Amino acid sequence: LKKKMALIFNTYPRWDRLVSCSHSVMEVNYKNLCKPNIKNKFSYAKNTINFQRVYDCLEEGCQYEGFEEPNSEEINFVTMGRLSPEKNHKNLVRAFGEYLKEYPKSKLYIIGQGPLQEEVEGEIERLGIKDRVVLTGNLLNPFTLMSKCSCFILPSVYEGQPMVLLEARIVGLPIVVSDFSSVEDSLMENGQYLIKSTQEAILEGLRAFAKGEVPTCKFDPRQYNKEAINEFEQAISK
């Protein structure tokens, strides 16, 4: 992978602009990749969001295969992403195991697949919480399930611009999110509960939601897209 990435980096002098997906990511790229012949090429523009797909999925609904719809009388946490090291699922599962000792009427839904599937399953088995953690696999329509849950949690160690946070905001979920290096560009005023990515901090975030301390904010995806397009136009016109 490093060799492949090096080949890509070597092409950078050929391009007019090197556009990152957020200001924070641009700063990281500038710090790690900048050379004299490309230092004026760095810019950024947020990704746009296909909000209509989310709305269409919510309207269509879906049938669940292999698991039941979340019980509205319980606290239901949900996360979505590839089962890979940076997503930090094992720390999430361990924290949730501790959380269940205090709030047993809760469930955790993990949407996605990936190389750590067996390890995550093994951790769930070891903790004896198979009846409280649901691994859904990949879903064509994850948003209906998300809409039936209580809170979205993203405990990642690192991210670029996590689109899943925007999708969770469109669905209207309260959000607990870790402070990965580029998180600043994904935050909204009074729009999330920020934690570290350690097991102890994730447990703190889960408890915070149970205590009513995790906020929900209004999110306008159309306005967001207008701003993202404006950023892109500015990025390529410099």
Predicted regions span which residues?
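A short, active-site helix/loop in glycosyltransferases that binds the activated sugar's phosphate group
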Residues: 15-44, 49-53
